[in-house]
C-alpha cells in the first residue's frame, strides 16, 4: 500500500502527472481499478478531459471522450453512491426543515429561557440564523450539546451554546427520519470496511481542503489502505498545491491551508514533486513565480515581463463589460481555433454585474453560462403566496396589484384581463376605496351621468367602467374564496392542504406548466420548491396550532433560501463565474472583472450567531481538548486565504489574462486599482501598466477596436458620429447598413431636432376652437413652456390621479375656507378688524367642518393620517387669518367680494354673478376671451376710492417684474385690468394695489426666531402664541399718497409692517419696495395686454416650441413638470432653455425696456 502526496506550484500539470502514473499501473496490472476524484463543481468537465487524455495515452483518438470501465471520474458524493450502490433512504434535511422546527420551538419556549437571545428572538431573520448555525455545527460532525462542555467559562459564548443546545434537544427527535446533506459521506466512511476495495486506487485532484464529512471519508480510505484492504499494490494519491518550506508568514502564507492539511492529516505520506509543467504562456509563468515570491518571501527575485497580461480601466461598469465583450468577440474572430468554452470571465462577486453582462453579451451575440445562482424570492409565485397570506387589509391597493400582476390569476379565454387591471389601478390610485366601497359601489373611473347621450365617446367610457367593475367582482370572488377557506384552518396540515388546493383550483400550476412549455422553467422550479416546503411543514409540524404569520414566514424563508438551477456550461459557452467557485484550469483566456480595491481582495464579515470572537475562543477550546475543529473559519482567516484564491483564479487560464475595473462604482464612489494588482505593477516587479479605455474611439485608427456585431457597432458608431461627425466613421456606414438596415435610422437620429412642428390650422381649430377661451394661468403656462401648454391644454394629457393631498387639493381647501369665512363677514356686514382671534378660530373650524363633508374633500376624513392633514391645513388658514387680521387693524379696509369671477362661464346664474371678462382681437380676426377668479377684493378706504386685489398663495410668492416681462407672471396685472373694467360693479373707483398673501404653512425657522429674540417656547408646544414677524403682503402698490395712507401711516425713517414700502429718514420713498408710479403702472398694464394677445396669436398659428423657462441652475419649467418623459428635453438634440438670466432683474430697467418696446410698436 502507498499513501502519497503530489506537490507542486500552480504552474505544474498535476493531471498529466497523475494520469501517467495511472497509465503505468493500468499497463502492468489488469486487475487494478482507478477512481479519479475531483471537486463536484468541475466534475463534468474534468471527466471529459481526464478520459480524453487517458485515451490519448492509450493511443486512442484524442478528440473522443473515452469511458473506461476501470477508470472512473467521480466527485466524493458520487463516489460514495458508486461504491455502496445505494442511496440514503432518508430525506435530506434542509435549512428550511430546521427553520420550521426552530421557529416552532421558539414560539413555545418561555422568553426568559432564551437568555442572551431574549430580545432578538422575535426579530425577522433570527429563526433562519439559528437554523444555519445548528446546521453548521452538525456538518462539523458535532452537536451543540457536545460543544457545550468544551467551553468551560460562564460567559457570552456559553450562553449562546446553551440556548442552541436547548433548541437542538427539542428538534432532534423530529429529525430522526432525516439525514444531513453530508451524511452519505459519513455513512460511506463507516461502511468502507465492509466494501470490497481490493485493487482500488484513488487519486484526488483539485482539493485545497476538505469539510469534516469529506475528511472522515478520506481518513477511512487511508485507514483501509493501511489495513491492506485495498491490496498491497494499491495507492491513494492526493495532489496538493504548494511546498512545505515557504511558511514564514503563518496564516498569511500563500500555501498555509494546504500546508496545514498536510501537517495535520498527511504528515506520514510520501511526498512526490510534480515535474510536468502546464503549457502556460510567458505571462502566466511569470505571474506564478512573481505572485508566489511576493506572498511567500515578500519580494521578487527579479523584474519580469507580462506580455499577455493587461490591466484596463473604464469609466463605469457598462463600458467595462462592453470592452470585455468587444475584446472577446474580436479574439474569437481573429483566432478560429479559439472556442467560447475556452474563455472564463471572473469576478469576486457578480452581484453588481448580473444584470449588465446578459444585456451586453447578448448585444454582441456571445454565448455564455452565468454561473451565479438567482434567488426564487422574486418569482411571481413567491409574491402571490406571500401577499395572499401577508396582509390584514384584504383590499389594500398594493396587495391587490402584487397578487394580480403576477400573471398567475386571470379570467379564461379573453385577452383583456391586463387592460381591465390597468384601468382598475388608475381608479384605485385616484380613489383608494375601502372594503365597503368595493362591495357596495360600482366603480366609475370616468364619471357619466344618466342623462348623457350615448355618443361614441360615452359608449367607450361606459365600456371602460363596465370592464373595471367586472374586474372588481372577479377580485372580490378570488379573495373572498381564499379568506373563507383559510378561516376554517386550525392546524398546519389543514393550511398546507388548503393552500395547495386553492392554487390548483385557480389553475396556477397549469399556468406555470404552460410557461415551462414555452421555455421558461423557473415557475416549475418554484412550484416544486413550494410543494417541498409544504411537505416539510406537513411532516414536521402538521398537527401544531396554525399561525398565519408563522406560516407566511416559513414560506418566505423557503423562497429566500432557494435558487434557480442553471444548466452547466457543457456546450460552447463562455463561463461567467465567481472567484470563490472551483474552476477547471485549462481555459485559454481569463477576463478578471471588477479588479478594484473595493472587491479584490474580498472583505468578509461574519453574520452568524457564533461570531468571529466566539470562534477564536472555540478554536482554543478544541485545541485544549485535543479535538479537531471543523467549524467555519473567522472572517480574518477567510481573508488570509484570499491571496491563494487569487493565485488559483488567475492560473485558471493558460494563455492570457485581462484585469479590468471601472472608475465609477454603482454607488457613485470612485474605484481604485486592487492592492493585489498595485503590487504586481510595481516597477521592480513587472512591466504592467494601466491602460485607460475611452468610452468611444478617439481616432479613426481606433475604430476597429470598437467593432463587434452589427448591433453593438451601430450603438458605438452612432455615438462616435454624434461626437466627431459622420466623416469620422466614413467607409463603415454602408457596411453596417447592409448588415443592419436599422442603422440607417440610427444615423438619421444624428440630425434629429427635438422640436415640435407648427400645427396645421385645421388641427388648431379642432383642439382649441374657433376663438380662444383661456385662463390667465394657461397663458402663463404657455410662456413657461409652450410645448407643455400644448400637451396639457391642447391634447388634454394629465398625470394619473392619486389618492393624496397634493398642492392642488390643499390649495382648493385653503381657498374654500377663506371664501366661507370672508363671505360670512360680508354677509353680516362685520368688519374684519372687529373680530377676536377666538371668533376667527370658530369661523374657520365651522367652515372646515362644512367642507370635509363634501365629496371633493372626502379624502380628508378617510383615515387618521388624512384627518391630521386636514387639521394642519385648517390651522394654516387660521394662522393666516390671524395675521391678516392684525394687518387689517392698521387701516379701515374691509372685504367686499370673494372668488370674484370675471369672464364667460357656463350657467346663467354664474353669468349673472360674474364680472365682465377681458377679450382681445387676434391677428386673423379671431378673438381671445379671458376668464379668471379673484380670491378677494378689499375696499381700502371709507370713501370707496381704492380697492385692493388679494390672491392667496401657499408658496411665499412675490411679484417678479422679470417674470411679468417674459409672460410667466400675468395674474395680478390681468386682475387689475379686469377690476378696472368692472370698478363700478364692485363699488370702487379704481384698484390701488394687487398683492399676494402667503398662507402660513411653513415650519418656524428656529434661527430666524432667535435672531428676533423670540423664545423657543413661544414657537413650539402649548405656549406657541407668537409668530416670527415676517408676514407681509407682496405685489404691486400704486404710488399714491392717499392709497398708501389707507394701508398704513408711515413716518420718516419707518417701514410699513405688513406692506413692502417705507420712508427714509429724509421722507423719501425707499428704493426697494413694491411701489409703482401711475406712469409705470400704465406701461405694465399695456405690456400685460401685449403678452396676452401675443400668446393668443402664437396659439392660433400652431406655435408650440419646446422652449422652457430657466430661472437659475436649480430651477426651470422642467423641474416639477409632469411631462418630462414626453418632452425628452435634450440639448444634444437642439433643445434650448429660455434663460431668464439674459434679462435685467432691476424693476426700473425692466419697465424702461417695456416702455421702449411699447414705443417701437
UniProtKB/Swiss-Prot annotation:
Transmembrane segments: none annotated. Gene3D superfamilies: 3.90.320.10, P-loop containing nucleotide triphosphate hydrolases. The keyword DNA repair applies. It is an enzyme of class 3 (hydrolase). Keywords: ATP-binding, DNA damage, DNA repair, DNA-binding, Exonuclease, Helicase, Hydrolase, Nuclease, Nucleotide-binding. It comes from the Bacteria. Its EC number is 3.1.-.-. One of its GO terms (molecular function) is ATP binding. InterPro entries: ADDB_N, DNA_helicase_suRexB, P-loop_NTPase, PDDEXK-like_dom_sf, PDDEXK_AddAB-type. Its cofactor is Mg(2+). The keyword Secreted does not apply. GO terms for biological process: double-strand break repair via homologous recombination. Heterodimer of AddA and RexB. Despite having helicase-like domains, this subunit does not have helicase activity. Belongs to the helicase family. AddB/RexB type 2 subfamily. The heterodimer acts as both an ATP-dependent DNA helicase and an ATP-dependent, dual-direction single-stranded exonuclease. Recognizes the chi site generating a DNA molecule suitable for the initiation of homologous recombination. This subunit has 5' -> 3' nuclease activity but not helicase activity. PANTHER family: RECBCD ENZYME SUBUNIT RECC. This is ATP-dependent helicase/deoxyribonuclease subunit B.
Amino acid at each position: 500500500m502507498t499513501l502519497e502526496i503530489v506537490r507542486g506550484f500552480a504552474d505544474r500539470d498535476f493531471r498529466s502527472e497523475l494520469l501517467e502514473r495511472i497509465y503505468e499501473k493500468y499497463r502492468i496490472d489488469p486487475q487494478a481499478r482507478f477512481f479519479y476524484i475531483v471537486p463536484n463543481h468541475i466534475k463534468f468537465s474534468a471527466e471529459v478531459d481526464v478520459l480524453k487524455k487517458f485515451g490519448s495515452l492509450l493511443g486512442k483518438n484524442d478528440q473522443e471522450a473515452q469511458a473506461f470501465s476501470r477508470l472512473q471520474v467521480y466527485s466524493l458524493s458520487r463516489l460514495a453512491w458508486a461504491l455502496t450502490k445505494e442511496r440514503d433512504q432518508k430525506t435530506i434535511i434542509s435549512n428550511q426543515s430546521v427553520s420550521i422546527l426552530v421557529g416552532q420551538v421558539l414560539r413555545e419556549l418561555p422568553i426568559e429561557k432564551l437568555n442572551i437571545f431574549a430580545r432578538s428572538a422575535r426579530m425577522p431573520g433570527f429563526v433562519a440564523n439559528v437554523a444555519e448555525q445548528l446546521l453548521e455545527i452538525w456538518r462539523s460532525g458535532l452537536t451543540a450539546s457536545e460543544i457545550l462542555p468544551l467551553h468551560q467559562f460562564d460567559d457570552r459564548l456559553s450562553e449562546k451554546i446553551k440556548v442552541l443546545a436547548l433548541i437542538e434537544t427539542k428538534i432532534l427527535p423530529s429529525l430522526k427520519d432525516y439525514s444531513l446533506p453530508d451524511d452519505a459521506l459519513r455513512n460511506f466512511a463507516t461502511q468502507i470496511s465492509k466494501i470490497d476495495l481490493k485493487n482500488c486506487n484513488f487519486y484526488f485532484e483539485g482539493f485545497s481542503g476538505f469539510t469534516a464529512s469529506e475528511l472522515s471519508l478520506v481518513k477511512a480510505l487511508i485507514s483501509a489502505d493501511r489495513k491492506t484492504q485495498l491490496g498491497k499494490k494499491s495507492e491513494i494519491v492526493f495532489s496538493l498545491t504548494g511546498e512545505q518550506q515557504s511558511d514564514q508568514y503563518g496564516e498569511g502564507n500563500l500555501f498555509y491551508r494546504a500546508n496545514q492539511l498536510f501537517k495535520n492529516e498527511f504528515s506520514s505520506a510520501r511526498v512526490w514533486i510534480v515535474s510536468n509543467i502546464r503549457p502556460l504562456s510567458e505571462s502566466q509563468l511569470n505571474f506564478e513565480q512573481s505572485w508566489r515570491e511576493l506572498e511567500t518571501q515578500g519580494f521578487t527575485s527579479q523584474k519580469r515581463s507580462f506580455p499577455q497580461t493587461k490591466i484596463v480601466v473604464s469609466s463605469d461598469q457598462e463600458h467595462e463589460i462592453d470592452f470585455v465583450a468587444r475584446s472577446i468577440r474580436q479574439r474569437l474572430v481573429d483566432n478560429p481555433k479559439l472556442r467560447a468554452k475556452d474563455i472564463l470571465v471572473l469576478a469576486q462577486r457578480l452581484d453588481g454585474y448580473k444584470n449588465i453582462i446578459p444585456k451586453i453579451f447578448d448585444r454582441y451575440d456571445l454565448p455564455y453560462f452565468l454561473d451565479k445562482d438567482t434567488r426564487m424570492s422574486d418569482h411571481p409565485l413567491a409574491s402571490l403566496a406571500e401577499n395572499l397570506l401577508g396582509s390584514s387589509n384584504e383590499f389594500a391597493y398594493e396587495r391587490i396589484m402584487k397578487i394580480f400582476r403576477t400573471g398567475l390569476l386571470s379570467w379564461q379565454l379573453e385577452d383583456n384581463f391586463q387592460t381591465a387591471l390597468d384601468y382598475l389601478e388608475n381608479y384605485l390610485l385616484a380613489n383608494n376605496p375601502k372594503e365597503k366601497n368595493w362591495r357596495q359601489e360600482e366603480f366609475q373611473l370616468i364619471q357619466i351621468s344618466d342623462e348623457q347621450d350615448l355618443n361614441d365617446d360615452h359608449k367607450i367610457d361606459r365600456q371602460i367602467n363596465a370592464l373595471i367593475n367586472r374586474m372588481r367582482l372577479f377580485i372580490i370572488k378570488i379573495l373572498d374564496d381564499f379568506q373563507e377557506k383559510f378561516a376554517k384552518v386550525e392546524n398546519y396540515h389543514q393550511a398546507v392542504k388548503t393552500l395547495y388546493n386553492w392554487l390548483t383550483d385557480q389553475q396556477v400550476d397549469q399556468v406555470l406548466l404552460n410557461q415551462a412549455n414555452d421555455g421558461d422553467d423557473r415557475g416549475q422550479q418554484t412550484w416544486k420548491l413550494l410543494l417541498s416546503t409544504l411537505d416539510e411543514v406537513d411532516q414536521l409540524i402538521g398537527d401544531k396550532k396554525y399561525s398565519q404569520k408563522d406560516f407566511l414566514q416559513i414560506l418566505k424563508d423557503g423562497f429566500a433560501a432557494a435558487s434557480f438551477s442553471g444548466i452547466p456550461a457543457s456546450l460552447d459557452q463562455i463561463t461567467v463565474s465567481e472567484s470563490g467557485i472551483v474552476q477547471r484550469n485549462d481555459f485559454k483566456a481569463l477576463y478578471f472583472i471588477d479588479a478594484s480595491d473595493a472587491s479584490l481582495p474580498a472583505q468578509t464579515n461574519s453574520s452568524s450567531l457564533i461570531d468571529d470572537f466566539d470562534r477564536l475562543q472555540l478554536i482554543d477550546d478544541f485545541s485544549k481538548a485535543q479535538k479537531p475543529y471543523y467549524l467555519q473559519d473567522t472572517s480574518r482567516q477567510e481573508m488570509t486565504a484570499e491571496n491563494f484564491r487569487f493565485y488559483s483564479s488567475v492560473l485558471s487560464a493558460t494563455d492570457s489574462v485581462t484585469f479590468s475595473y471601472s472608475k465609477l462604482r454603482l454607488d457613485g464612489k470612485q474605484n481604485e486599482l486592487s492592492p493585489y494588482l498595485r503590487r504586481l505593477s510595481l516597477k521592480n516587479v513587472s512591466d504592467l501598466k494601466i491602460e485607460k479605455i475611452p468610452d468611444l474611439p478617439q481616432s479613426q485608427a481606433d475604430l476597429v477596436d470598437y467593432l463587434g456585431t452589427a448591433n453593438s457597432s451601430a450603438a458605438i458608431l452612432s455615438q462616435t458620429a454624434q461626437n466627431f461627425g459622420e466623416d469620422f466613421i466614413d467607409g463603415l456606414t454602408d457596411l453596417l447598413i447592409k448588415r443592419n438596415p436599422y442603422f440607417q435610422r440610427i444615423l438619421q437620429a444624428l440630425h434629429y431636432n427635438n422640436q415640435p412642428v407648427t400645427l396645421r390650422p385645421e388641427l388648431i381649430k379642432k383642439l382649441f376652437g374657433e376663438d380662444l377661451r383661456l385662463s390667465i394661468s394657461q397663458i402663463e403656462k404657455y410662456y413657461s413652456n409652450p410645448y407643455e401648454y400644448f400637451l396639457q391644454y391642447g391634447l388634454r394629457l394629465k398625470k394619473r390621479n392619486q389618492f393624496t393631498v397634493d398642492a392642488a387639493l390643499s390649495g382648493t381647501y385653503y381657498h374654500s375656507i377663506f371664501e366661507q369665512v370672508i363671505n360670512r363677514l360680508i354677509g353680516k356686514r362685520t368688519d374684519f378688524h372687529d373680530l377676536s382671534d377666538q371668533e376667527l378660530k370658530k369661523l374657520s373650524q365651522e367652515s372646515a367642518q362644512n367642507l370635509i363633508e363634501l365629496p371633493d374633500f372626502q379624502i380628508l376624513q378617510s383615515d387618521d393620517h388624512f384627518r391630521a392633514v386636514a387639521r394642519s391645513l385648517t390651522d394654516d388658514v387660521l394662522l393666516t387669518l390671524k395675521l391678516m387680521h392684525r394687518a387689517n387693524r392698521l387701516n379701515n379696509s374691509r372685504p367686499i367680494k370673494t372668488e370674484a369671477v370675471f369672464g364667460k362661464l357656463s350657467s346663467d346664474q354664474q353669468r349673472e354673478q360674474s364680472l365682465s371678462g377681458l377679450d382681445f382681437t387676434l391677428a386673423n380676426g379671431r378673438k381671445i376671451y379671458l376668464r379668471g377668479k379673484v380670491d378677494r377684493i378689499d375696499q381700502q378706504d371709507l370713501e370707496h376710492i381704492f380697492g385692493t386685489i388679494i390672491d392667496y398663495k401657499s408658496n411665499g410668492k412675490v411679484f417678479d417684474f422679470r417674470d411679468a416681462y417674459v409672460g410667466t407672471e400675468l395674474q395680478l396685472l390681468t386682475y387689475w385690468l379686469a377690476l378696472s373694467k368692472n370698478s363700478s360693479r364692485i363699488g370702487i373707483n379704481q384698484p390701488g394695489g394687487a398683492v399676494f398673501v402667503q398662507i402660513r404653512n411653513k415650519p418656524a425657522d428656529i434661527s430666524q426666531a432667535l435672531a428676533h429674540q423670540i423664545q423657543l417656547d413661544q414657537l413650539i408646544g402649548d405656549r406657541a402664541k407668537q409668530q416670527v414677524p415676517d408676514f407681509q403682503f407682496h405685489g404691486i402698490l400704486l404710488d399714491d399718497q392717499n392709497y398708501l395712507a389707507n394701508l398704513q401711516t408711515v413716518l420718516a425713517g419707518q417701514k410699513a409692517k405688513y406692506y413692502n414700502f417705507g420712508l427714509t429718514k429724509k421722507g423719501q420713498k425707499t428704493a426697494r419696495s413694491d411701489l409703482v408710479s401711475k406712469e409705470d403702472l400704465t406701461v405694465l398694464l399695456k405690456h400685460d395686454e401685449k403678452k396676452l394677445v401675443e400668446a393668443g396669436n402664437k396659439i392660433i398659428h400652431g406655435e408650440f416650441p419646446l422652449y422652457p423657462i430657466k430661472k437659475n441652475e436649480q430651477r426651470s419649467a422642467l423641474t416639477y413638470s409632469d411631462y418630462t418623459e414626453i418632452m425628452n428635453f435634450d440639448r444634444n438634440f437642439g433643445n434650448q432653455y429660455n434663460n431668464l438670466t439674459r434679462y435685467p432683474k432691476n424693476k426700473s430697467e425692466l419697465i424702461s425696456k417695456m416702455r421702449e418696446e411699447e414705443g417701437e410698436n
